[in-house]
Amino acid sequence: TVSTATDAKIIASKIANYNHPEYPELDDFGDATLVGNNGATGYFRVDWFTPDGLRTWGDGRTFILGTEGYIELRKYLDVTREGGGDHVFWVDNKGEHYFDAAGKVGFPYFGKLVLDCINRTENAMTQEHAFKAAELCVRAQLQAVKVE
C-alpha cells in the first residue's frame, strides 16, 4: 500500500440510493473514511452517476495527498481535453508536474494477479492484504449511515 498501513478502522461511511427508487435494496452511492494503524487517513467514494455527456463509462480519478505534495491520477480521461487517459499530475516543493503515462507502463499488476490466482502465489498482493481490503469494505457497508 502507499501508506504502509497494515490495518485500518472505518471512521465514517454512508450509502444511498439516489437515482433508482425502483430498486430499494440497492445503493448507487457509497463512501467511507478510514484511519490506518500508522495514522494515515483515506477516503473513497463510489457511485453510478456518470453523466451521459462523459465520453467514457466512468471518471476513474485517484488523489494521493502527502505532507509535501500530492498526486492526481486520471485513468480514463482529462475532462474537456482531447485524447485518452493515463494522466499523472503531481505537485511538490519544486513545482507542478505532468506525465503522460499512456502506453508507457502497460498492465503488469493484472497479469501478476491472474498468475497469483492460477499459481497460488502472492506477487500482485498478499492474500492478507486482499482479505483486509474486503473486510474493511464489508465493515464500511455494515456501519454505513443510510442517506434517504
Regions found by a protein language model. Name each.
Residues 50-54, 80-83, 106-107:
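A short local loop/turn or secondary-structure capping micro-motif enriched for an aromatic residue
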Residues 61-62, 78-94:
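Short polybasic amphipathic segments
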Residues 69-75:
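Broad, structure-driven detector of short, well-ordered beta-strand segments within folded domains
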Residues 47, 75-76:
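Surface loops and adjacent helix of pleckstrin homology
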Residues 98-111:
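Active-site loop of classical SDR/Rossmann-like NAD(P)-dependent oxidoreductases
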